[in-house]
C-alpha cells in the first residue's frame, strides 16, 4: 500500500484543470472562504492500494457540481488560442443530474476521456421506510460520515495534493485491511442495509476482514427487518451477481454465510445441510484449480456459466428440495434465484437443470452398470450444450452428499466418466442426427403415432449410440425385431 497518491499523466492533467478552474471561480468571487476541491471515495482507496481507477468523484463546497462543471467550459473558453490547445479535445459531454433542490444538482463531465462526477459536499438523513436519504448541503465531515465504510472516506485535496483522513481511521483501516463503518454499524445498516452486501463485496474483492462490530450489527434482528423492508430484490440480485463475477467468489460466499447474511438474501438454512457450504467451497476451489488437468476440455465456460456455477454452490443446501409451480416441479435454488434475487432466466434455468440432473450423473459415477454409451449419450443429448456445466456441478453435488464424502475420490470417479465420454466420442451427442424421422419409422417399422412412436424413436437413438457406424437397414431390422 502507498503512503501517498501518485498521479498518472491523465490524472495530472485533470487535477491541473480542476485547480485552474477553482482559481478562475475564486477570481470572480467576493467571498473570503476558499473553494475546496477534492477527489473522493473509491478512486482514493484504489490509488493507495496501487490499483488503477477511472472512477473519479469530485466533491465541492460553495458551488454545485453543475456550476463547477460549467465553469470548466467557461474557463477553457476564456483562454487565448495558444493556451487553449491542451484542452481542445479534452472536454466531452456534460450531463446534468437534476435534483429537487437546485443547490444539490450534480453533473457528470468527460475530461480527457474520463467520466467524472461533480457533487457538492452533503449531509444525509434517513427515515425507517427507505434507504434513499434526504440530502442537504454539508461539510467535508458530514460527507465523510455519510459514506459506507471508513476505507471510502478518504479525500485527495487537489490544491495540496495531500490525503485527508477526516475520520482519523480511514488510512489505518485501509492499511490493516479492516472493513468498519464511520458511524455506528447498527445505525449505518438501519439507514441503508444495502451497505451490508456492498461491504461483503468489498471485503471479498480486496481480501479485507470485517470488523466484529460490523458482523454483530449484521446479525441484529432489527437490521434483518430493515433489509427486507428497504432493499429491493433486484438490488440484492445485482450485488450477489457482482460478488460471484469477481475474482474471489469463494471468499464472498464464505462471508455471506459466516456473517449470516444468507438468511435475508437466500433463505433459512436447513440445519442438516450446514456442512455442505464449506465442502462445496472446498470442492469448487479444487475444481477450478485442477480443471486444466482433470477436465481440460470443459475449461471454456462462459462468464454466465461460471457465475451460475458459483450461484449453484451458494444455494447447494436447498438443491434437493422442490416445489410445484403451476403443475411443474421446480427446485428451490431456481425459485430463490427467480423470486428472491430476481436474476435472469439464464441462471434460473441453469440452476433447475443442474439440480434435476445432478443425481443422474452421481448415479452414473457410483454404479458402473449404468455407464454405457446408450445411457450417457442419451443424457448428453437431453442436456444439449449445457451438459458440461451440469457435469461440473454434479462433481460438487457428489462431493457434498455426505459429510464423509471424499473430494479426491469423487474427482477420480468423475475423471473416469469424463474419459469415457471423450473416448467414446459422446461429447457432441446432442448433434447426432436420427437415422430415421417419425414418418419413416411409421412406414418402415409399422408403428402408430403417439407413445409407441416415441418409445421406438428412443430405442433407435439408443441403438445408434451402441452402433455409431450402423446403417439405416440395420436400424430398421433392429426396430422391427422389437415388435416380435
Swiss-Prot record:
GO biological process, one term: mitochondrial tRNA 3'-end processing
Broad enzyme group: transferase
ERhxxExxxhh motif, short sequence motif: residues: 234-244
Sequence motif: B/A element, positions: 122-124
Keyword ATP-binding: yes
GO cellular component terms, semicolon-separated: cytosol; mitochondrion
Signal peptide (from-to): none
One term of GO molecular function: ATP:3'-cytidine-cytidine-tRNA adenylyltransferase activity
Gene3D superfamilies reported for this sequence: Beta Polymerase, domain 2, cca-adding enzyme, domain 2
SUPFAM superfamilies given in the database record: Nucleotidyltransferase, Poly A polymerase C-terminal region-like
Enzymatic reactions: a tRNA with a 3' CC end + ATP = a tRNA with a 3' CCA end + diphosphate
EC number(s) from the headed UniProt entry: 2.7.7.-
Keywords, in A-Z order: ATP-binding, Cytoplasm, Nucleotide-binding, Nucleotidyltransferase, RNA-binding, Transferase, tRNA-binding
Lyase as UniProt keyword: no
Annotated disulfide bonds: none
Main location: cytoplasm
UniProt comment concerning the protein's domains: The B/A element (residues 122-124) is present in cca2 but not cca1 and is thought to position tRNA-NCC for terminal A addition.
PANTHER family named among the record's database cross-references: TRNA NUCLEOTIDYLTRANSFERASE CCA2, TRNA-NUCLEOTIDYLTRANSFERASE
Protein function: tRNA nucleotidyltransferase involved in the synthesis of the tRNA CCA terminus. In contrast to what is usually observed in eukaryotes for which one enzyme synthesizes the whole tRNA CCA terminus, in S.pombe, cca1 specifically adds two cytidine residues to a tRNA substrate lacking this sequence while cca2 specifically adds the terminal adenosine residue thereby completing the CCA sequence.
Family: Belongs to the tRNA nucleotidyltransferase/poly(A) polymerase family.
The protein, known as: tRNA nucleotidyltransferase cca2
Organism: Schizosaccharomyces pombe (strain 972 / ATCC 24843) (Fission yeast)
Primary gene name: cca2
Amino acid at each position: 500500500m502507498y503512503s501517498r497518491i501518485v498521479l498518472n499523466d491523465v490524472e495530472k492533467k485533470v487535477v491541473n484543470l480542476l485547480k485552474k478552474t477553482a482559481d478562475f471561480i475564486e477570481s470572480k468571487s467576493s467571498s473570503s472562504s476558499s473553494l475546496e476541491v477534492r477527489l473522493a471515495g473509491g478512486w482514493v482507496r484504489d490509488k493507495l492500494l496501487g490499483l488503477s481507477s477511472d472512477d473519479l468523484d469530485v466533491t465541492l463546497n460553495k458551488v454545485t457540481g453543475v456550476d463547477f462543471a460549467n465553469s470548466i467550459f467557461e474557463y477553457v473558453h476564456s483562454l487565448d488560442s495558444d493556451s487553449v490547445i491542451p484542452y481542445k479535445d479534452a472536454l466531452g459531454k456534460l450531463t446534468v443530474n437534476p435534483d429537487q433542490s437546485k443547490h444539490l444538482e450534480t453533473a457528470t463531465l468527460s475530461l480527457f476521456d474520463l467520466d467524472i462526477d461533480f457533487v457538492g459536499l452533503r449531509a444525509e438523513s434517513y427515515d425507517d421506510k427507505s434507504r434513499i436519504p434526504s440530502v442537504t448541503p454539508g461539510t467535508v465531515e458530514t460527507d465523510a460520515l455519510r459514506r459506507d465504510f471508513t476505507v471510502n472516506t478518504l479525500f485527495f485535496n487537489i490544491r495540496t495534493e495531500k490525503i485527508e483522513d477526516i475520520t482519523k481511521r480511514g488510512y489505518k483501516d485501509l492499511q490493516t485491511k479492516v472493513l468498519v463503518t464511520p458511524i455506528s454499524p447498527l445505525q449505518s445498516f438501519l439507514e441503508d442495509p444495502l451497505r451490508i452486501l456492498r461491504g461483503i463485496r468489498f471485503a471479498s474483492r480486496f481480501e479485507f476482514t470485517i470488523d466484529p462490530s460490523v458482523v454483530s450489527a449484521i446479525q441484529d434482528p432489527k437490521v434483518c427487518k430493515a433489509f427486507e423492508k428497504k432493499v429491493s430484490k433486484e438490488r440484492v440480485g445485482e450485488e450477489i451477481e457482482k460478488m460471484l463475477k469477481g475474482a474471489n467468489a469463494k471468499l464472498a460466499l464464505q462471508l455471506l454465510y459466516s456473517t449470516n447474511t444468507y438468511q435475508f438474501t437466500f433463505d433459512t438454512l436447513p440445519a442438516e445441510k450446514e456442512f455442505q457450504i464449506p465442502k462445496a467451497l472446498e470442492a469448487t476451489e479444487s475444481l477450478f484449480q485442477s480443471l486444466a488437468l482433470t477436465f481440460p476440455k470443459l475449461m471454456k465456460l462462459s462468464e454466465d456459466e461460471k457465475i451460475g456455477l458459483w450461484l449453484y454452490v451458494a444455494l447447494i443446501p436447498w438443491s434437493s428440495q422442490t416445489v410445484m409451480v403451476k403443475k411443474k416441479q421446480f427446485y428451490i435454488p431456481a425459485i430463490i434465484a427467480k423470486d428472491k434475487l430476481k436474476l435472469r432466466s439464464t441462471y434460473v434455468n441453469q440452476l433447475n437443470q443442474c439440480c434435476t440432473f445432478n443425481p443422474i450423473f452421481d448415479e452414473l459415477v457410483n454404479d458402473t452398470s449404468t455407464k454405457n454409451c446408450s445411457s450417457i449419450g442419451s443424457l448428453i443429448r437431453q442436456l444439449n450444450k449445457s451438459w458440461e456445466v451440469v457435469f461440473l456441478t454434479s462433481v460438487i453435488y457428489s462431493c457434498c452428499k455426505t459429510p464423509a464424502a471424499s473430494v479426491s475420490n469423487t474427482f477420480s470417479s468423475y475423471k473416469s466418466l469424463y474419459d469415457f465420454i471423450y473416448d467414446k466420442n459422446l461429447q457432441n451427442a446432442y448433434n447426432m442426427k436420427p437415422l430415421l424421422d417419425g414418418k419413416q419409422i411409421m412406414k418402415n417399422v409399422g408403428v402408430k403415432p403417439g407413445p409407441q412412436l416415441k418409445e421406438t424413436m428412443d430405442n433407435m437413438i439408443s441403438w445408434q449410440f451402441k452402433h455409431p457406424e450402423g446403417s439405416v437397414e440395420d436400424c430398421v431390422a433392429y426396430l422391427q425385431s422389437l415388435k416380435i
